[in-house]
Amino acid sequence: MKPFLRQTLDRQLLRLHELDSLLSATDVVSDLDRFRALTREHAEASVVAEQYTRLTSREADLASAEGMLAEAKDDPEMAAMAEEEIAAAKLDIAQLDEALQLMLIPKDPDDARAAFIEIRAGTGGDESALFAGDLFRMYTRFAERNRWQVEIISESPSELGGYKEVVLRMDGPTDATGVGVYGKLRFESGGHRVQRVPATETQGRIHTSACTVAVLPEPDEAVAIQINPADLRIDTYRASGAGGQHINKTDSAVRITHIPTGIVAECQDDRSQHRNKAKALQVLSARIVEKDRSERAAKDAAMRKGLVGSGDRSDRIRTYNFPQGRLTDHRINLTLYKLLAIMEGDLGDVITALQVARGAEQLAELETASNGF
C-alpha cells in the first residue's frame, strides 16, 4: 500500500475516535440534523476502520509466516505450512488493499441516489429498437439481482417489439460503501453499439446498430420546487401504445416543457393525470440538473480527459458482438466473452471494472494533491 493511503487511513482512525466522543456529547445529541450527519459519517468510518484493522492483522500474519519460513530450513513440513500461510495472507492483503482504495475515493453524494435510466433507439431502425428492448431487459434483470424497485416512467414501443424510447426509475438500498443505484449505473451513459444478425435478415448478414443510454441521479425534492412554474408549459394528451391504439379515453398523459432550456419530459404510464404530472416533473428536474452537470463536466474535460469518459450520449462506450459472444468496453479496453450472461443482467464484472478504473484516476489525483503538486 502506498504511504499516502496509509496516512489517510491513520487519519480515518483518529477521526473515528473523535466521532465516538462527539456522538456522546449533549450538544450534539440535542441537534438532530448534526447527530444524523455524524452518525452517517461514523457508520462509513467504521467500515473503513474494520477493513484497515483486518489489513494490518493480515500484514502481521504475513510477517510472522515469513519469519517462520526463514527458520524452517531443516523442517519441510513447517516450511510448507509457512508457504501456504504466506500465499493466503498475500491474497487477503491484495483484496483488502483494493477494497480500502475504493473506500478512500471521495464520495459523490449523488452515488447514493435513485436514478432515471433513459434508453433511446438510434441508428439501425427496427433492429435498434429491438436492441433498446434488450438493454431494457438487461438493466431490469440487473435491478432484480440487486433487489431494486423498477418503475416505467414513459415508454414508446416499436411496432416490431422493443422500444423507440423508454425511461425507467430505479431505487434501492445502498451497499456497505454507500453506493446506490446511480453510483452503480452512472457509467452506463453513452452510446451502445450492437453487432448481430437481425431476426429480419434473410441472408445471414451481420448488421450494426446503436442505442444511447443516459443515467441521471434523481434530484432532491427541493430542486423540483425551485423550478419556476412560469417557466413550464404543460400539455396533456391521450396515452397511446404501439400502433397508436389508445390505452384510455382521457387526457391522462402529460408533457412538460421547460421553456428556458427547451428540455421536455413526458409520462403516460399511469391512468392518473396527477401522478403522470408528478413523474414527468421528476424526470424534468433530473434532466435540468444533468444539463448543468454536463456543462460543468465539459469545461473540466477541456482541462483533463478522464479515462472513463464524460457520460455524454455521443460517447461510444461499448460494443455488443453477438456472433463472437463478446462485450467490449472501449473506455477501459475491457473485453469479456460472456455476452449472453451479461444480457441476462450479469453486469457485476463490467460495473466493478469501471468503478476500479475511475477509482484509480481519483486515487492518482489524491496522490498528486498529497504531494503538493
From Swiss-Prot:
SMART domains assigned: PCRF
Post-translational modification: Methylated by PrmC. Methylation increases the termination efficiency of RF1.
Subcellular location: Cytoplasm
Highest taxon in the source lineage: Bacteria
Leader peptide range in chain numbering: none
One Pfam family recorded for the sequence: RF-1
TM regions (residue ranges): none
Keywords: Cytoplasm, Methylation, Protein biosynthesis
GO molecular function, one term: translation release factor activity, codon specific
GO cellular component, one term: cytoplasm
Protein family: Belongs to the prokaryotic/mitochondrial release factor family.
NCBIfam families (alphabetical): prfA, PRK00591.1
PANTHER family: LD18447P (PTHR43804:SF7)
Record's function text: Peptide chain release factor 1 directs the termination of translation in response to the peptide chain termination codons UAG and UAA.
UniProt-recorded name of the protein: Peptide chain release factor 1
Source organism of this protein record: Polaromonas sp. (strain JS666 / ATCC BAA-500)
